């Protein structure tokens, strides 16, 4: 489980993480998240192939039912046919209602997944902003210190060249300034390698936009099929029901296919979310070559992990204090004797004030709480909202596949019964919800009131 403060793997993550991981040779594979390794990829593909097996079973059931329908329908008596027509019609209606319920679940799951991915991209952009701010603050401060060393401190050395005690103080100040610049330059741990957090956020957002749109189109397609199927049954439009039956067959393939993809994604995501710290550390270090101590500091952010920048920050703080003391002594003792040095000392003092302000801002940015919060928010978005959304999408695909399987089996019998609806209605069951005679009686009864 993750040791990150503020994140704990959910119970559904734990359950999915315990799903057996088996490769194509039916050998058990380690469930540690390793998408770059072929055995782990085989395990996810094996899970996805379960949906393919379900598709094959549903196709066999459909074929068996249709063969039985074509061969045995003529042998049924009138009472049996009438009763079966009513059952078939209600079966179609029930399948459509279940499919509509699944569509509602799918819309919710798609929205939850999108919210989770949006939280991930937002956290990545925040982290990128923090890292960029650290680099800019360090580079600006180092440039400011270097410019003061090249100009004002060099001029002060020339002014105090004949006074050894003042010259020693200026040279000590120069060494302290150079030391601060060196310490700050070594703190900059993120050199902006690709992919940086912002580039990763853009890539994730790009993929999510197309994923969200694809599911919206699939959900709308399912909804349109359900509505037109109900319309065809209610109006007894044979050609419309036939078209919806054919389209339902293709959507059945999409439903089982999406279910396989969602099943593999859910299990893979649970493997990552059960222990994200190790994978994030290994991948980040492999890509960026950042010191492992720095990564551990920001990922864990607890009292057991020491701040890797503490020594450099402490040395820089002491150097700034020494510079302040030396400048105060020069202003008190040297300015009365060398009035021309006052302007340069004021410039150096302004540099010191600016550097101290930047230093305190840098200390706040380097604190682990900011980047760790972004890290935890990204984990929560991916492993809470994202995982929940994928599970709801998985349920949608399953309900949709079952509904379309039932509809494909039921609709042929339904359209066969109302193909001659204009000829005779006497053999239709009165309990049929779409009986035209019953509809006419209801209209006549309303008009007589």
From Swiss-Prot:
UniProt entry tagged with the keyword Transport: yes
Cytoplasmic-side segments: 65-86, 234-238, 410-449
Glycosylated residues (UniProt): 128, 282, 353
Compartments, record wording: Cell membrane
Entry keyword set: Cell membrane, Chloride, Chloride channel, Disulfide bond, Glycoprotein, Ion channel, Ion transport, Membrane, Transmembrane, Transmembrane helix, Transport
Transmembrane regions listed in the UniProt entry: 44-64, 87-107, 213-233, 239-259, 389-409
Any GO MF annotation of the entry: volume-sensitive chloride channel activity
GO biological process, one term: L-glutamate transmembrane transport
Highest rank taxon of the organism: Eukaryota
InterPro entries per the UniProt record, alphabetical: Tweety
UniProt key word Transmembrane helix: yes
CDD domains, per database record: Tweety_N
Catalysis performed (reactions): chloride(in) = chloride(out); L-glutamate(out) = L-glutamate(in)
Disulphide bridges: 273-383, 301-368
Family affiliation: Belongs to the tweety family.
Quaternary data: Homotetramer; disulfide-linked. Homodimer.
Function: May act as a calcium-independent, swelling-dependent volume-regulated anion channel (VRAC-swell) which plays a pivotal role in the process of regulatory volume decrease (RVD) in the brain through the efflux of anions like chloride and organic osmolytes like glutamate.
Protein's recorded name: Protein tweety homolog 1
Native organism: Xenopus tropicalis
Organismal lineage: Eukaryota, Metazoa, Chordata, Craniata, Vertebrata
Gene from which this protein is expressed: ttyh1
């Amino acid at each position: 489980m993750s040791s990150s403060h503020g994140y704990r793997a959910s119970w559904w993550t734990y359950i999915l993480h315990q799903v057996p991981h088996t490769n194509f040779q039916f050998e058990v594979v380690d469930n540690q998240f390793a998408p770059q390794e072929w055995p782990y990829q085989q395990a996810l593909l094996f899970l996805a192939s379960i949906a393919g097996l379900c598709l094959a079973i549903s196709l066999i059931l459909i074929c068996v039912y249709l063969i039985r329908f074509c061969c045995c329908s003529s042998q049924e008596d009138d009472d049996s046919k009438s009763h079966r027509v009513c059952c078939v019609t209600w079966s179609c209606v029930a399948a459509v209602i279940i499919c509509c319920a699944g569509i509602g679940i799918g819309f919710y799951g798609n929205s939850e997944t999108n919210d989770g991915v949006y939280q991930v991209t937002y956290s990545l952009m925040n982290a990128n902003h923090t890292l960029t701010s650290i680099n800019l603050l360090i580079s600006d401060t180092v440039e400011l210190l270097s410019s003061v060393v090249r100009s004002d401190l060099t001029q002060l050395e020339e002014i105090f060249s004949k006074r050894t005690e003042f010259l020693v103080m200026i040279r000590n100040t120069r060494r302290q300034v150079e030391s601060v610049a060196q310490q700050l330059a070594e703190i900059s741990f993120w050199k902006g390698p690709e992919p940086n957090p912002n580039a990763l956020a853009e890539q994730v957002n790009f993929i999510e936009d197309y994923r969200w749109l694809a599911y919206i189109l699939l959900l709308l397609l399912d909804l349109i099929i359900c509505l037109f199927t109900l319309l065809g049954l209610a109006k007894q439009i044979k050609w419309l029901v036939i078209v919806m039956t054919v389209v339902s067959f293709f959507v059945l393939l999409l439903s089982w296919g999406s279910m396989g993809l969602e099943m593999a994604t859910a299990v893979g995501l649970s493997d990552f979310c059960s222990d994200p710290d190790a994978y994030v550390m290994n991948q980040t270090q492999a890509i960026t070559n950042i010191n492992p101590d720095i990564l551990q500091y920001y990922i864990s952010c607890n009292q057991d992990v020491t701040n890797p920048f503490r020594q450099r920050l402490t040395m820089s703080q002491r150097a700034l204090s020494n510079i302040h003391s030396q400048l105060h002594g020069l202003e008190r003792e040297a300015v009365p004797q060398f009035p021309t040095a006052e302007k340069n000392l004021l410039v150096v003092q302004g540099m010191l004030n600016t550097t101290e302000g930047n230093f305190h801002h840098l200390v706040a940015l380097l604190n682990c709480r900011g980047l760790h919060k972004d890290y935890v928010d990204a984990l929560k978005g991916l492993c809470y909202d994202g995982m929940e959304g994928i599970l709801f999408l998985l349920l949608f695909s399953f309900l949709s596949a079952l509904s379309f399987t039932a509809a494909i089996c039921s609709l042929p019998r339904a359209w066969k019964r109302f193909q001659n609806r204009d000829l005779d209605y006497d053999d239709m069951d009165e309990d049929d919800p779409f009986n035209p005679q019953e509809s006419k009686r209801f209209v006549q009864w309303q008009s007589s009131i």
